[in-house]
């Protein structure tokens, strides 16, 4: 059994920060369970472009409001607590936070923990 608190992660290499987000990574590749689990903050008033071409991501909003836009079609969905979206086709997308949002994110394959987005909004596929 693995038990971690947010305090265990903050300030470690499992706590990554970008310009518009910060990600606290609870479950990682080294845990050998086939997925990773992140507690992610999206800063209020920001827009981020992401493309997880190497990962499938499920995102569940637990705080705040915003929207996600599928880049290829322009479709927009509103996000609020209780809303989930799944990037099951490695969808290129924009994430816009009206207020600070807190999201629970599951990635497959699992993240190593040190990933940050490259110039294309992509997490590289890292090996430990």
UniProtKB/Swiss-Prot annotation:
Keywords: Lyase. GO terms for biological process: ectoine biosynthetic process. CDD domains: cupin_EctC. Pathway: Amine and polyamine biosynthesis; ectoine biosynthesis; L-ectoine from L-aspartate 4-semialdehyde: step 3/3. SUPFAM superfamilies: RmlC-like cupins. Its EC number is 4.2.1.108. It holds the Pfam family Ectoine_synth. InterPro entries: Ectoine_synth, RmlC-like_jellyroll, RmlC_Cupin_sf. One of its GO terms (molecular function) is ectoine synthase activity. It catalyses: (2S)-4-acetamido-2-aminobutanoate = L-ectoine + H2O. It is an enzyme of class 4 (lyase). Catalyzes the circularization of gamma-N-acetyl-alpha,gamma-diaminobutyric acid (ADABA) to ectoine (1,4,5,6-tetrahydro-2-methyl-4-pyrimidine carboxylic acid), which is an excellent osmoprotectant. PANTHER family: L-ECTOINE SYNTHASE, PTHR39289. Belongs to the ectoine synthase family. This is L-ectoine synthase.
């Amino acid at each position: 059994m693995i038990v971690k608190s947010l305090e265990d992660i903050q300030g470690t290499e499992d706590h990554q920060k970008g310009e518009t987000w910060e990600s606290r990574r609870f479950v990682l590749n080294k845990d050998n369970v086939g997925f990773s689990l992140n507690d992610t903050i999206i800063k209020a008033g920001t827009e981020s472009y992401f493309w997880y071409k190497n990962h499938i991501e499920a995102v569940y909003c637990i705080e705040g409001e915003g929207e996600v836009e599928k880049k290829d079609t322009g479709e927009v969905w509103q996000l609020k607590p209780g809303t989930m979206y799944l990037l099951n086709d490695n969808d290129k997308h924009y994430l816009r936070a009206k207020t600070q949002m807190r999201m629970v994110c599951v990635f497959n394959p699992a993240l190593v923990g040190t990933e940050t987005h490259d110039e294309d909004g992509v997490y590289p596929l890292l090996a430990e």
